[in-house]
């Protein structure tokens, strides 16, 4: 589907939060990482490999990232998505929720906001569990959610683009079990925000990225 739509993706290897200190577990991780790359490397939609996410099972980040770059020099590596950055890989990768969006100390790597937002709205009758919910900021109406979302993009995300932001990944496309922070409900039946409003807001984001590319390279991006 991603190939057909012309969408690039990031592929991450699921890692247990426990057992990172055991040699056998590390060896198993490395073996499964190698198997994953071999199985998926022929898909051109994959733009980056992500060995570790939010510190889960993370170990020897630099060595793992360097191995990935040798194994597949055609793709980027996000060595530690979100937390516990060890200066490895191609991205300074951050997850930011509930506080103002900002970048860390600049270095030679690309600045990537690999998770942000998580704005949540429950639509009764369209959730996985009526009695549980998870999100980072909750709203009671679609209008309030939309207003806050557009403000987040216009006042916080877009200014970061001129500061070197290269990636912005919003949480998230759909509700996932008790997580109610999707653009769509869990059953994919309800759009929580009007598509026309989202399109207009997203076009401003795309335009800001295109302007940043033009300023840095002298060449505009495809809008």
Regions picked out by a protein language model, each given a short descriptive name:
Residues 1-200, 210, 217:
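Substrate-binding/catalytic cleft of secreted carbohydrate-active enzymes
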Residues 204-223:
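Surface beta-strand/loop "capping" patches
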